[in-house]
Amino acid sequence: DQYLTNSAKIFGVKKEYIYTVLKKYYDGFVFSFDSDKTLYNPWSVLNFLERPNNGFKNYWYQSGGTPSLIMQYFKVKDDFDFLNYKNREKYFNLNQLQYKYEITNIPTEILLYQAGYFTAIKETNNIAKLITPNEEVEESLLDLYYNNEFKCRVWNR
């Protein structure tokens, strides 16, 4: 509570506002299909509370979201439209999300789900919708896209 009070004081806002922004940036991970509870990225929350003067920074890559595998994957696969992923809803059978795929034939959205870039929201008994869990992860995913797109253009000249 003292850390939240300190953060609110630094920003000149009420603690409730800090809670709201923490949720927007760092919450949203779902780890059980049978629960509507979401989890915060603890690394990001701890880093923010330790240094609120830095603002709501992106700590995703520091928390294990390092994109090496994803970047390598996108060098050989180009079936995922980063710019439009947010505008289309993708639904998968829960068994598909838990299946152990070979890296050569895993659907892109499921790879991103298994790597933590998407979280699954259960829609019906066996169907889940994949979404980005929060702004921190969404920003990281877009960063991957822009870096990958730029590199592809440079390599293909």
For each of these PLM feature ranges, what is it?
Residues 1-48, 82:
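Amphipathic alpha-helical segments of the small helical/lid subdomains adjacent to P-loop NTPase cores
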Residues 40-157:
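Extended alpha-helical interface modules used as scaffolds for assembling large macromolecular complexes
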